[in-house]
C-alpha cells in the first residue's frame, strides 16, 4: 500500500512539472509574423513616395534615393542590386536580375517594355494590284488625259476667236450697220452737205480749227460781233 501511494504522488508531481514547463515555454515562445512585403512591414518609413511606388523589389530611402533588392530562388536571402536616382532605373535593374535568376517564370515590373522590346519589327506587306484596281487606275488616267485635251482645245478655240474673227461675224456687223436709222429719216440731209467755209463765215472769219488753239479769243470775238450787230 505504501508503494502505491508513493507512485501516485510521483505521477502527480511529474504532471505538475510538465504543466509548469509548458506554461513557461508558451510564455517564452514568440509568434512569427506573416510574410508580407517589405513596404507593408515598414509602413510609415522610407521616402515620401515609397508607398506609391508600384514596382516590385523597389523602395525609397528617407533621403530620396531608390534601392532595388531581389530574393534568391528557394532561399530567403535578398540580393542587393544597388542604389538608383529614380524608381524606373531601380525597376529595370530588378527586371534584369529576375530574368537571370528565374528565367521565363520571372515576375517583371515593365511587362509592356519587355514585350515591345522582344517583339520583331513589323515587316511592310507589299500591296498586290488586283484587276479591279488596275482597271480603276487606267480609267482615271484616261479620263484625266481626256480632260486635259479638252481644256487645250478650248484654249486654242478662244485664241483663234480673239485673233482671227470669222467672216460670218463681219457680215452680221455690216447688216447691223445698214439697218441703223440714217440722217435722211430725220430730215437732216442738209447738215451733212454744209461746207467748212460757211461755218467759218458764221463764226466771224475764225476757222473751227482755231477754236482748239485759243477758245478764249474766239469767245471774245463772237461777243464783239454780236454787240455790233445789235
Swiss-Prot record:
Q: Where is this region: Disordered?
A: 1-31, 122-149
GO terms for MF = DNA-binding transcription factor activity; transcription cis-regulatory region binding
Provide an example Pfam family for this protein. AP2
* Cellular component, GO annotation: nucleus
Compartments reported by the entry: Nucleus
The record's principal subcellular location, in a coarse class, is: nucleus
- PROSITE patterns in UniProt: AP2_ERF
Which PANTHER family did the record assign?
A: DEHYDRATION-RESPONSIVE ELEMENT-BINDING PROTEIN 2C (PTHR31241), DEHYDRATION-RESPONSIVE ELEMENT-BINDING PROTEIN 2D (PTHR31241:SF62)
Give a short account of what the protein does.
Probable transcriptional activator that binds to the DNA sequence 5'-[AG]CCGAC-3' of the cis-acting dehydration-responsive element (DRE).
Tell me the protein's name.
Dehydration-responsive element-binding protein 2C
Q: Which organism is it from?
A: Oryza sativa subsp. japonica
Taxonomic path: Eukaryota, Viridiplantae, Streptophyta, Embryophyta, Tracheophyta
Q: Which gene underlies this protein?
A: DREB2C
